[in-house]
Amino acid sequence: MSPSDLHLPVPGHPIAAIATPVGVGALAIVRISGAGVLDLADRVFRKVHGSGKLAEAAGYTAHFGRLYDGEEMVDEVIALVFRAPRSFTAEQMVEFTCHGGPVVVGRVLRLMLDNGCRLAEPGEFTRRAFLNGRIDLLQAEAIGEMIHARTESAYRTAVSQMKGDLSVRLGGLREQLIRSCALIELELDFSEEDVEFQSRDELTMQIETLRSEVNRLIDSYQHGRIVSEGVSTVIAGKPNAGKSTLLNTLLGQERAIVSHMPGTTRDYIEECFIHDKTMFRLTDTAGLREAGEEIEHEGIRRSRMKMAEADLILYLLDLGTERLDDELTEIRELKAAHPAAKFLTVANKLDRAANADALIRAIADGTGTEVIGISALNGDGIDTLKQHMGDLVKNLDKLHEASVLVTSLRHYEALRNASDALQNALELIAHESETELIAFELRAALDYVGQITGKVVNEEVLNTIFDKFCIGK
């Protein structure tokens, strides 16, 4: 299904929303968009100097005036006029910059609703921009990514996608696929004449080139995911090793419950912190031990599941443990079970161990891992730990200026499906299969690529994407 086949609940119906964060501020913005919003605005807006209507004003112009509810003045505002199709939504738009108190902002919004607008749904302004052809779906998602970016790398990647860098790459792929599909379709049209418009060797070379390009984008997802979501970092270890204390210390706040009772953390807790421009997504997991209760058993199962997905595992052990050999065995087994993850052993409660240096050397020798000594309680060694964490993942979060990255799981899965379809087409050609089967796989690859930019889309996907936006975006 193409975007033109989809429809808004009421196409072009005027919508209104607050476009700035809720709270007290110097200024706030209330925006309206849709058919007839300039006339709607003229019913409540009066210029302070001069005359003339907003409906008669040129686009990209600002007008100082007052908003009135009947004869009662609501606020002094600046009205910015945008004319279709040169607006964010490609519709008529007005943005009122008013004073930023919550009461006055609420009054301005209510004024718009009382005069014919309805409250916008989450992401509806951006959704209209997409459906009206102002931006593609990938660019729409990039707007949300830029708003929520927490690091410079995430911001730069979102800006790159918003500019259309990835869209251009995908557009080139799609054009090549369309050409290949067109030649195959011609053969089907002239099947009775046994005409071959392109040799199978040439078609094979084209598909191999296309698949290589698709696979390069797939390979960028590991990097792109880290840039967008942060380095997935799991804090693992035995119960009461100090995992929750370490989480709180790294975050600089109390997020996890700290208790001397083993097994306090039954499920995992996730929080993020940024060190040296790299975002780490920390997961405090349930302690690894023989579970006594069903709920604890489930927590440990989830802990191991999170470790399987981790980019970095911090194994925390208590230097005062009486079962050091068991800990060393656990570390060796975990490291062997997760070869793709970076691994760091963290020796906790440094302040309580009389022979800490000797113990740390023994742990390093017994596990073959790098060991950092800390006291999660008083903060000793935490800066060193952060530095080592950054060093371990610096290559994962190194963004080159010219990079085009895939950051979304949705895009990644669509590309994987496209790559599989192209591989199927290559195998069909190699086995001299029917042209209809080859054409089917090429069309499938074309649809998968189109799903990313919105050339092929369905309502459920759009709802999933735009429901993540705030009301005013």
Curated annotation (Swiss-Prot):
State where (6S)-5-formyl-5,6,7,8-tetrahydrofolate binds. R31, E95, R134, K473
Short name of one Pfam family: MnmE_helical
Q: Which GO terms describe its molecular function?
A: GTP binding; GTPase activity; identical protein binding; metal ion binding
Q: Which cofactor does it need?
A: K(+)
> What GO cellular-component annotations does this UniProt entry give?
cytosol
Q: Does the keyword Nucleotide-binding apply?
A: yes
Summarize where Mg(2+) binds, as residue positions. S244, T265
In terms of PROSITE patterns, this protein maps to: G_TRME
Q: How many cofactor units bind, and how?
A: Binds 1 potassium ion per subunit.
**Where does the protein end up?**
Cytoplasm
Q: Does the keyword GTP-binding apply?
A: yes
Question: What are the EC numbers?
Answer: 3.6.-.-
InterPro entries from the UniProt entry: G_TrmE, GTP-bd, GTP-bd_TrmE_N, GTPase_MnmE, MnmE_dom2, MnmE_helical, P-loop_NTPase, Small_GTP-bd
Q: Which GO terms describe its biological process?
A: tRNA methylation; tRNA wobble uridine modification
Alphabetically sorted, this entry's keywords are: Cytoplasm, GTP-binding, Hydrolase, Magnesium, Metal-binding, Nucleotide-binding, Potassium, tRNA processing
Q: Where does GTP bind?
A: 240-245, 259-265, 284-287
* Domain of life from the UniProt record: Bacteria
The UniProt entry's sequence similarity note says:
Belongs to the TRAFAC class TrmE-Era-EngA-EngB-Septin-like GTPase superfamily. TrmE GTPase family.
What job does the chain carry out? Answer: Exhibits a very high intrinsic GTPase hydrolysis rate. Involved in the addition of a carboxymethylaminomethyl (cmnm) group at the wobble position (U34) of certain tRNAs, forming tRNA-cmnm(5)s(2)U34.
Which proteins does it associate with, and in what oligomeric form?
Homodimer. Heterotetramer of two MnmE and two MnmG subunits.
PANTHER family linked: TRNA MODIFICATION GTPASE GTPBP3, TRNA MODIFICATION GTPASE GTPBP3, MITOCHONDRIAL
Stated name of the protein: tRNA modification GTPase MnmE
Q: Which organism is it from?
A: Chlorobaculum tepidum (strain ATCC 49652 / DSM 12025 / NBRC 103806 / TLS) (Chlorobium tepidum)
Q: Which gene is annotated as encoding this protein in its UniProt record? A: mnmE
